[in-house]
């Protein structure tokens, strides 16, 4: 009986551990997204290049009502998953989509170039459907 209980607890803890991982990193901009009150001119959606640009030039972003939503290491599928929360819900006029570098580097495993292009195309279609101009 103890053995069954031990295995049950072991598998339950593994399942709970897997559920706590935030693959798309929704938490990263959760509080910042809630604090945006004015419609941004542009949201920059991307990976480390975008992430570091915002950190190195904060005045440029603030002075122009630009918002940075880059996350280092992210691939196009992760960006697509968080696109609603980090772009659409902010209602920008324009979204600049900077991605594909980490897909090519296989940061999240193998992905075909066709799938990368489809992810980018999907983000563009979602943006257009919400009245946002996509720039790739």
Model-derived features with residue positions:
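Hydrophobic alpha-helical membrane-insertion segments
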Residues: 11-12, 56, 109
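Short, glycine/serine-rich, charged loops/turns that create anion-binding
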Residues: 11, 49, 102-103
């Amino acid at each position: 009986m103890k053995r069954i209980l031990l295995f049950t607890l072991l598998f339950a803890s593994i399942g709970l551990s897997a559920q706590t991982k935030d693959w798309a990193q929704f938490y990263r901009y959760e509080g910042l997204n809630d604090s945006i009150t004015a419609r941004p001119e542009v949201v920059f959606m991307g990976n480390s290049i975008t992430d570091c640009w915002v950190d190195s030039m904060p005045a440029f972003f603030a002075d122009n009502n630009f918002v940075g939503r880059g996350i280092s290491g992210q691939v196009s599928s992760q960006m697509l998953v968080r696109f609603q929360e980090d772009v659409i819900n902010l209602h920008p006029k324009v979204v600049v989509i900077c991605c594909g570098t980490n897909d090519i580097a296989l940061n999240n495993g193998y992905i075909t170039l066709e799938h990368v292009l489809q992810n980018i195309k999907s983000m563009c279609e979602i943006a257009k459907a919400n009245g946002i101009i996509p720039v790739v």
